[in-house]
């Protein structure tokens, strides 16, 4: 089915696999099945024109995948050859600055990719996923009113910015500065990005997977699709496992 859109002063509605409704007054979002719309109602809808072509979308995915593969290959080589010792406070300063810069640019990537599609973010914040794992986040409720491909781009763009930046910096570093501190920062942040790609713990990988499969996460646990439930259970298991290990480490 083609992507359809309807908008008036009260509501914004997008139709793709499901019916997504934004109540402009309350700021609430709703999701209904396709059969909730009558043929008469569908006559009021217009074709939704995506801002990026399918060709550009797949080119974007391919380039991001290539950056990830090259990053991972280089990371494995470095892990086999670089010393794991942290040399003094200067290295720690570089690593901290490296992380802060990448975290800020990551969230800006989400924000400005959403703005590119004519939508706005809700808020930026800090939270504990499953009450254990710390994470910065940008609330992107307006992605509900984007097409599937556009949602994927928004959720992936933070990672795209990170891989583009750290791969470029590491390439320059290898041929010029040969700074072990920069390489160590590259290794640590690359490992962090791997966790963000794995579709668990409310990661970007998790949001990309849900967008790809046209699924959503609901606040009521039992309402969710079995795949979402499985991922949530794995997340709870990881959280419990981490807490137990931290307690054992402190006690011992």
Curated annotation (Swiss-Prot):
Domain of life: Bacteria
Function of the molecule: Required for production of the modified peptide YydF. May process the precursor form of YydF to release the active peptide (Potential).
Record GO biological process: proteolysis
Organism: Bacillus subtilis (strain 168)
Key words, A-Z: Cell membrane, Hydrolase, Membrane, Metal-binding, Metalloprotease, Protease, Transmembrane, Transmembrane helix, Zinc
Family to which this protein belongs: Belongs to the peptidase M50B family.
Active-site residues annotated for this sequence: 107
Transmembrane listed as a keyword: yes
Induction (free text): Transcriptionally repressed by rok.
PROSITE patterns: ZINC_PROTEASE
Protein topology in the membrane: Multi-pass membrane protein
Gene: yydH
Name the UniProt record assigns to this protein: Putative peptide zinc metalloprotease protein YydH
Transmembrane segments annotated in the record for this chain: 56-76, 85-105, 152-172, 181-201, 231-251
Gene Ontology CC: plasma membrane
Molecular-function annotations in GO: metal ion binding; metallopeptidase activity
Lineage: Bacteria, Bacillati, Bacillota, Bacilli, Bacillales
């Amino acid at each position: 089915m083609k992507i359809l859109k309807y908008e008036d002063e009260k509501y914004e509605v997008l139709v793709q696999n499901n019916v997504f409704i934004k109540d402009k007054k309350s700021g609430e979002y709703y999701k209904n099945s396709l059969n909730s719309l009558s043929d008469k109602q569908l006559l009021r809808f217009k074709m939704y024109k995506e801002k990026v072509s399918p060709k550009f979308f797949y080119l974007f995915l391919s380039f991001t995948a290539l950056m990830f593969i090259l990053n991972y290959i280089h990371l494995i080589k470095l892990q086999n050859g670089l010393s794991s010792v942290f040399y003094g406070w200067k290295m720690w300063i570089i690593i901290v600055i490296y992380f802060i810069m990448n975290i800020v640019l990551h969230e800006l990537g989400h924000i400005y990719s959403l703005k590119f599609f004519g939508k706005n973010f809700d808020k930026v914040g800090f939270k504990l996923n499953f009450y254990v794992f710390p994470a910065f986040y940008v609330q992107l409720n307006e992605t509900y009113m984007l097409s599937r491909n556009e949602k994927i781009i928004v959720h992936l763009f933070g990672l795209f910015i990170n891989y583009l930046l750290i791969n470029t910096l590491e390439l320059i570093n290898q041929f010029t500065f040969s700074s072990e501190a920069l390489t160590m920062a590259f290794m640590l942040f690359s490992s962090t990005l791997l966790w963000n790609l794995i579709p668990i713990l409310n990661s970007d990988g998790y949001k990309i997977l849900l967008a790809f499969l046209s699924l959503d996460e609901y606040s009521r646990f039992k309402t969710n699709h079995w795949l979402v439930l499985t991922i949530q259970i794995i997340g709870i298991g990881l959280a419990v496992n981490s807490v137990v290990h931290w307690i054992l480490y402190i006690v011992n």
